[in-house]
Swiss-Prot record:
Optimum temperature is 39 degrees Celsius. This is F(420)H(2) dehydrogenase subunit M. The keyword Coiled coil does not apply. InterPro entries: NADH_Q_OxRdtase_chainM/4, NADH_UbQ_OxRdtase, ND/Mrp_TM. Belongs to the complex I subunit 4 family. Optimum pH is 8.5.
Amino acid sequence: MLPVASLLILVPLIFAVVTFFTKTKQLAAGFGFLGSLATLGLTLYAYLNFDSSTAAMQFYESVSWIPFLGVNYSVGIDGVSMPLILLNAIVIPFMILFTWKEEMESPNRFYGLILTMQAAVIGVFVALDFVVFYIFWELTLVPLFFIVNLWGGANRAHASYKFFIYTHVASLVMLLGIFGLFYTALNQTGVPTFDIRELIAQFQFFEPGLMKDGIFLAILFGFLAKLPAFPFHSWLPDAYSEAPTAGSILFILLKIGGYGLFRISLPMLPNTGSPQLMIMILGLLGSVSILYGALLALRQKDLKRMIAYSSLSHMGYVILGSAGLVTLSVSGAMFQQFSHGLIMSIMFMSAGAIQTAAGTRIINELGGLAKKMPMLTVAMMVGFMASLGLPGLTGFIAEFLVLTFTFTNLPVFVVIALLAIVVTAGYHLWAMQRAMFGVYNEKLGDVRDINSIQVFSMAVIALLVLYFGLNPSPVLDMMINNSEAIVSLAAGMGV
């Protein structure tokens, strides 16, 4: 069998290197698109050969790297990582197509950084060794920093440095937790290892106390800051709104915070000194993120900042469902990651298209754009309706599972989250009505609809939002067995 996990990292990296040396926009975009298509092909091969009936690791590879430290190049794919790899592989080719006709400086660097970002994110998803995991984790910072800093809006320098410093500091805290995990396990066993699954298994034998809980919280902090969750979200609105359209979508596809929560934090949680307290902390952060993000989204005048705060609100469901520690609540949290990536891609494409066509994304300066941009309006409607949780679309499936199956264990936090539903509907409908319907603002001049390539790109993603909303099983089935394994571990520890 092909070394799929390694190829999923290597292929976009190879195309990234080639793209960096191209001389024209068409060649840069072309090689970028070909690289993303090759990655999609490999992903579909992995998906079609993936066994959804088991929680076991598949496409496993392991090679000794630094033997005296117990570091191995170990990679694999399971039901936690496969949906997120699929999400990235699907969206990025259409994101590149969407930007095909955009004028930009240094397109070779732009598309090369996109492919580098894709390789780094997939590297995080397949890594089974903490050293490999952390290398790819940190690598994701570099392309995002430069994409915002070089091709972003007027405040791009502030936004890019704020994002880099904030998330890098959080990553260093996480690294301290990883080292604490490694050294404590080494003292107990005498055998060095950075294997993620082995260290999580060893964690249960650590002496209860401040050190043990400190290790857990340090690692968790790194994930929550990257997700992000309230109150670690201050980098998000500036970074999302100042990034170019492709950069905003790459931020949305950066699901490594939620992934780390499922892969590492939840399996460790039952073995902390105070698991019930940790669950309450997660439940509180999740529910507050949902409501707080929705309230801030309602206040925004800038369409892109509204979408950014909406993203914060939606990520709250990932945390809340995780805290529910029921198979279907955790599965709903995982599905929310997948759904959110599709939905927010449409929404940021919509905001980018409006800014390009109308010269502004201030909601009160728009109006009646549906008359001039009917194709965009249809795609945007799908994204906005899915984001507010309309039945039949992916957003409904995820939020329904999280709220329904978390209620038994954490009813108060679910009630807090339910308060946000009305607010969420309000800001989505208000923004659509003000921007796309009503009287056309003649000051906008002769606004043109999105081009045929952009229509195609948005239509494919919108159809996937509809398809997986009506038939979530092709993705959800992969998640359920792994969710059940996490929940069974918690039940075995009496949580």
